[in-house]
């Protein structure tokens, strides 16, 4: 049934995730863009998110970047090892070509973002690599917003993050994690 919900599942199964993006990264478009946009809009309306400097992690062709721009973010950096051509063509800026394993190894050390958004990608990280990626992200931001079509990934508090709060737009979930020990550990509610 998962294949019915995600049109990319058969391609991932046939080619592997990396193989798919190596073959199609330059022309990639997330088939769930409306869900990404809706979930981001709902997240910004529901929680107090600092959008002063955002990292769009696994930025694809810019689905989250474009939605975040519409929501008031104007300093957005993109990272994706496969879709840089598609991102550049669509949003007019380059994406840094880093892999999750590069991030786990400290490639982003010394840099900070107010919020990191990872849309439809963190659940694809190998389970053995996920703790290192999460711990590295906890060193560069206080807020991690994961946009996902399901309840994965499962991030443990020992990896640097508090249990999340969640909102849902249609079938797309927005899960906000705050870094353990962050200056503001609250999940402030936006004024409505």
Residue ranges and their predicted role:
Residues 131-143:
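A short glycine-rich, Lys/Arg-flanked "PGG" loop and its adjoining helix->strand segment in the class I
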Residues 114-128:
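A short SAM/SAH-binding and catalytic strip from SAM-dependent methyltransferases
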Residues 141-152:
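Conserved beta-strand signature within the Rossmann-like core of class I S-adenosyl-L-methionine
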Residues 55, 61-105:
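Class I SAM-dependent methyltransferase SAM/SAH-binding core
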Residues 172-192:
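Core SAM-dependent methyltransferase catalytic element
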Residues 2-49:
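Class I SAM-dependent methyltransferase Rossmann-like catalytic core
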Residues 157-179:
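Conserved Class I S-adenosyl-L-methionine
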Residues 106-116:
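A short acidic, Gly/Pro-enriched loop at the edge of an enzyme's catalytic core
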């Amino acid at each position: 049934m998962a294949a019915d919900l995600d049109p990319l599942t058969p391609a991932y199964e046939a080619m592997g995730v990396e193989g798919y993006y190596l073959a199609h990264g330059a022309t990639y478009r997330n088939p769930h863009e409306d869900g990404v946009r809706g979930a981001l809009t709902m997240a910004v309306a529901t929680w107090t998110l600092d959008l002063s400097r955002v990292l769009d992690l696994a930025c694809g062709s810019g689905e989250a970047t474009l939605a975040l721009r519409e929501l008031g973010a104007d300093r957005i950096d993109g990272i994706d090892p496969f879709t840089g051509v598609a991102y550049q063509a669509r949003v007019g800026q380059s994406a840094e070509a880093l892999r999750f394993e590069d991030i786990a190894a400290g490639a982003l050390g010394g840099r900070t973002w107010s919020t990191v958004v990872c849309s439809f990608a963190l659940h694809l990280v190998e389970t053995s690599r996920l703790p290192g990626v999460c711990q590295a992200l906890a060193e560069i931001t206080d807020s991690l917003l994961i946009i996902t079509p399901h309840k994965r990934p499962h991030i443990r508090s020992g990896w640097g993050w508090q249990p999340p709060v969640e909102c849902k737009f249609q079938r797309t979930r927005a899960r906000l994690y705050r870094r353990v020990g962050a200056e503001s550990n609250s999940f402030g509610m936006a004024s409505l």
